[in-house]
Structure formats: structure tokens, C-alpha cells
């Protein structure tokens, strides 16, 4: 949408269908969303400044002042997309959060979850949303501390939001999902532990300032994992590395030298496409 002059909106009673995703994306001046009380399909209950679908109590569209009330059951695809929210509180009632719910929300710096929520948790000081058993980190933000005990970092968990210069993934983490740290331009160095068993495709793509990667786990680097990391110049790979996927280092314009362990028996021909790599030992 991107209507920067839009300051309020009222959804009339005759509206029966609203498209997927946040219809108010990047409407940064919009502080008020109201749905007519006589609308049979949608409401803005509890003055939440959002649009909720009545049939399943799913929040589908928001603005910068939207609050998630304890009468909302689900956060839909891209429902907060492009908003400038800083704080997220997940109440007890929410049982479903789309992995795309907070796409484009790069200014989040505080996350909490109600202790009574049966699906999600947020350990004190973590500023993250985790699965109830604490093993999967589903959503992080600029100030997240990855708790000990986390075994998986979900798809798009930190997309564009991680703000620390050194990313040190804790031991015990076994998997990093697709796009998990994509477009996190603050990251300068990434240290990936021996415990890793899988890195999803595109996991670090477009991290513009990522310069150093230390991979300690003998795994396969997935397709496009470090694609478009224009500053990447130093990559440390362990003995036992199994392979390097399609365009794993695509367009890494600063990568001139890399030492590939003899154990890596499967390296896709275009793994280093558009890289100035002149030496691959």
C-alpha cells in the first residue's frame, strides 16, 4: 500500500472480502483502523486498531499501533508486514502464528509471551518466541538472546532483524531454517557450531556486511546459503564437510580464496558463480 498520508480508515459494513496479507503495508502514518460494528465478516474488537476475521478470530491487517488482544486466536500471513512496531506481546489466546506474520518488521526490539499460552513461550530476557518445549526459536528480533536448549532456528526467524555484529549460534542448535538470517545487514561475523546438522537454503542470503564465516560442522552447505553476501571474504570450512550446494556462494564479490576440505565430494559446478575466487585448495 504505502499510503504515507493515510491517517485513519473505517471498514464499512458491506465489505465481505479482504485480500491476503496486510493491506496497509508501509502506511507508516496510519494509527487507527476501525471496522463498522454492523459488518458481519470482520471486526476491530477491543479497539485493537486492526482487522480481525470473525469466522476464526484471525488478525489479518494491522498498523503501527495494533495490539494483539486475548480474544485473537491466530496471526495471519503478512498481517504485520511493513509496520513500524517495536513491541510484540503474544497473549494466551493465540495458538497459530504464520511464519510470515512479521515480515518486513525490522524495528522490533522487545517480544513477550503470556505465561499461560499453551503453544508458545518466551524465556525471560530472550526477546523471542519459542515453541512451548523451548526447542525451536520461531521469531527473533534485534535484541534477541538465543536461549540455551534451542535446537532449531525456524524459517525466516530473524529475517532482516538481527542487529548484533557477531552471530554466535549456541552449541546444541542442530538446524537453521530457510532465510533464517537473510538480509541481516548488521552481522559481520557468523560462527556456526559443531552441533549443526542442517543449514536451510538462503539462510544468510543478502547479508550485505557479512565478512567472516566460521563453519564448524561437517555438513552440506545448502543452495544459495550465502548468496549475495557481497562483503564475504573469509570462509573457514571444517574437515569432514560433505558438499557445497547450487550457488551457495553466488555473487560473493569479495570472496577471492577458499580452502575446501578433501572430504567435500559433492560441489555443484555453479557453487561459486559470479565470485572472483581464483584459488580453491
Predicted features by range, described:
Residues 53-56, 131-134:
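Short acidic-glycine loop/turn motifs at beta-strand connectors
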Residues 3-17, 27-49, 57-74, 82-96, ...:
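Structural signature of tandem-repeat unit edges
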Residues 21-22, 77-79, 99-101, 155-157, ...:
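Consensus positions within tandem repeat domains that build extended binding/scaffold surfaces
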Amino acid at each position: 500500500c504505502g499510503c504515507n498520508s493515510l491517517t485513519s480508515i473505517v471498514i464499512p459494513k458491506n465489505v465481505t472480502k479482504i485480500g491476503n496479507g496486510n493491506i496497509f503495508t508501509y502506511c507508516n502514518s496510519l494509527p487507527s483502523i476501525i471496522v463498522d460494528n454492523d459488518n458481519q465478516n470482520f471486526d476491530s474488537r477491543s479497539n485493537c486498531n486492526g482487522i480481525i476475521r470473525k469466522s476464526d478470530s484471525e488478525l489479518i491487517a494491522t498498523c503501527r499501533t495494533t495490539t494483539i488482544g486475548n480474544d485473537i486466536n491466530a496471526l495471519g500471513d503478512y498481517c504485520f508486514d511493513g509496520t513500524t512496531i517495536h513491541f510484540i506481546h503474544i497473549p494466551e489466546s493465540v495458538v497459530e502464528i504464520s511464519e510470515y506474520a512479521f515480515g518486513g518488521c525490522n524495528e522490533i526490539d522487545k517480544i513477550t509471551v503470556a505465561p499461560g499460552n499453551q503453544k508458545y513461550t518466551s524465556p525471560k530476557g530472550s526477546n523471542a518466541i519459542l515453541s512451548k518445549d523451548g526447542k525451536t526459536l520461531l521469531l527473533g528480533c534485534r535484541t534477541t538472546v538465543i536461549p540455551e536448549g534451542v535446537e532449531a532456528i525456524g524459517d525466516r526467524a530473524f529475517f532482516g532483524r538481527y542487529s548484533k555484529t557477531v552471530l554466535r549460534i549456541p552449541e546444541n542448535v542442530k538446524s537453521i531454517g530457510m532465510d533464517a538470517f537473510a538480509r541481516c545487514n548488521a552481522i559481520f561475523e557468523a560462527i556456526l557450531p559443531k552441533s549443526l546438522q542442517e543449514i536451510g537454503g538462503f539462510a544468510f542470503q543478502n547479508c550485505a556486511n557479512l565478512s567472516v564465516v566460521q563453519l564448524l560442522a561437517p555438513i552440506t552447505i545448502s543452495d544459495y546459503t550465502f548468496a549475495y553476501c557481497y562483503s564475504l571474504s573469509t570462509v573457514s570450512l571444517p574437515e569432514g564437510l560433505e558438499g557445497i550446494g547450487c550457488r551457495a556462494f553466488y555473487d560473493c564479490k569479495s570472496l577471492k580464496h577458499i580452502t575446501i576440505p578433501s572430504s567435500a565430494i559433492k560441489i555443484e559446478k555453479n557453487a561459486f558463480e559470479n565470485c572472483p575466487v581464483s584459488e580453491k585448495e
